């Protein structure tokens, strides 16, 4: 692993005077810096402005070179606020791209875009660092085998399975269980795959980032007593950050994930919330740099920027990075260039439904709207495919009958339709599941359900063998044996009441 100079702390002052330039112009978060002839920095090099403002406060602003303007000038985008900077201030070229700490030292900690800890838990070991700008793995390194990434969550594994090293779009509004689903996936990958997770908060609310951190500590995903046993590293670039930080924070998180994949040879889960904010920040930077806008005001390099991030998220022969990306769709317009460009990269979509959340069915994953390219007989096998299709058909028929039931009632349906409705309601409830990370709130122990068990359970419901069981027996259980046991208990309880 190449060790690069870090862009913060006392080490910067040791860089030779030959790397120095001066601020020539400041336009918001964009700086034009003049260097002497022959000392020009490269594109993506990290520059540091160190000095004092007019009030005597110390300034340490890191920038990234974006354009070489000619006349020995470069244009750079600041990664933090440019308050207090003045023309003529000294700028130091670090001679390398922005580098961030990687490895086990990052687990359980919160970082900003520069790889600096922001959780008040002391310094982080920076002996091993990695540059945030890297090329995607070569074709010869890629693992092209199509394999399912088992999550232990029934509705996901059966109806919209994730691909190992794939990219999943997570669509969900506020309060439908997105955070809990994210935390459960982080927990399950750590237990079942011995993997770790990296969470990149791109342009999200500071409050949401804080809530996620607190909930992770409460559920044990972050171990406060022994921080090294934590299962996740967090990287935040919130809404209040300059566009440069929001544009690069996704790369910082990805760089940390790549180290776990390439060096530790682990399966890594990378969460990006929200991928739209990455595009939005890129659009702001593009406008500040004076580029001609493209369709709907987006940057002309939209596809290139998205591609350079997404192509690094992949499986290699060493390990895999499976990415789950929250996708905001502006004005619910799926043809908007930002979501449209994102969809081109996704292998699966997990849609969270407010209707299911209102019924108390968690995880509130919509079984009919969620899709996956992996749900093909040649990949998942005939048995899995047939079971998934029959489950979807049953739920679709139930959806079609709901209007009739609402107007005329259940008694007006044919015998066959009544049976379909009864089975669909059992399936709907069996798609719910108690989560490990929700134990502290619900009091019921979490369940990890293997794919074979999931398929067996739904086959039994579809075959009609469990038609005599009450539908509440299928609610918030793990495998089908638990539902059977619950049905027996309910029967005993009802007899005792009589």
UniProtKB/Swiss-Prot annotation:
BP-aspect Gene Ontology terms: proton motive force-driven mitochondrial ATP synthesis
Record-level GO cellular component terms: chloroplast thylakoid membrane; mitochondrion; proton-transporting ATP synthase complex
Enzyme Commission numbers on file: 7.1.2.2
Chief localisation class: plastid
Listed InterPro entries: AAA+_ATPase (IPR003593), ATP-synt_VA_C (IPR055190), ATP_synth_F1_bsu (IPR005722), ATPase_a/bsu_AS (IPR020003), ATPase_alpha/beta_chains (IPR050053), ATPase_F1/V1/A1_a/bsu_N (IPR004100), ATPase_F1/V1/A1_a/bsu_N_sf (IPR036121), ATPase_F1/V1/A1_a/bsu_nucl-bd (IPR000194)
Keywords, ordered alphabetically: ATP synthesis, ATP-binding, CF(1), Chloroplast, Hydrogen ion transport, Ion transport, Membrane, Nucleotide-binding, Plastid, Thylakoid, Translocase, Transport
Entry-linked PROSITE patterns: ATPASE_ALPHA_BETA (PS00152)
Catalytic activity: ATP + H2O + 4 H(+)(in) = ADP + phosphate + 5 H(+)(out)
SMART domains from the UniProt entry: AAA
Topological category with respect to the lipid bilayer: Peripheral membrane protein
Origin superkingdom: Eukaryota
Protein name as catalogued: ATP synthase subunit beta, chloroplastic
GO molecular function, one term: proton-transporting ATP synthase activity, rotational mechanism
SUPFAM superfamilies: C-terminal domain of alpha and beta subunits of F1 ATP synthase, N-terminal domain of alpha and beta subunits of F1 ATP synthase, P-loop containing nucleoside triphosphate hydrolases
Subunit text: F-type ATPases have 2 components, CF(1) - the catalytic core - and CF(0) - the membrane proton channel. CF(1) has five subunits: alpha(3), beta(3), gamma(1), delta(1), epsilon(1). CF(0) has four main subunits: a(1), b(1), b'(1) and c(9-12).
